[in-house]
Amino acid sequence: MSLYEATKDLHHACEAHALGGRMSKGNVTPQEWADWLWAFRCLHSVVDQSLPAHMARDGLLAADLSVLPTARPSKAALTFAAGLVGHDVTGAAYVLHGAHRSGGRVMAPILSKRGLPCSHVVYIDNEA
């Protein structure tokens, strides 16, 4: 079974979540978007160290966050990120970059129309 197949139900659960539903419709607040991006950045602070430089999202997430309200730190993201330290992060990288490459391409145009920054979903290397 592929990782995609194994996580398909989780993806659908995210889309059915209240915040996920608002995000997909572009109805997320700037504060919610900041909090979401902060959690992504927390995870990328661990994952990006194991990836080629062109895959790094930390600087792009920092740029996106710089124009948003101050994010509220997520204990869940901090705990999950700490659990990744010292372990193979291939699976986490797959999920994070899949979210940016697939979901981000769908949601970025919607969120950008609302003035919410989405530079973290732009990849210089289209094969990344």
Protein language model features and the residues they cover:
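Metal- and O2-centered redox machinery and metal/ROS homeostasis
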Residues: M1-A128
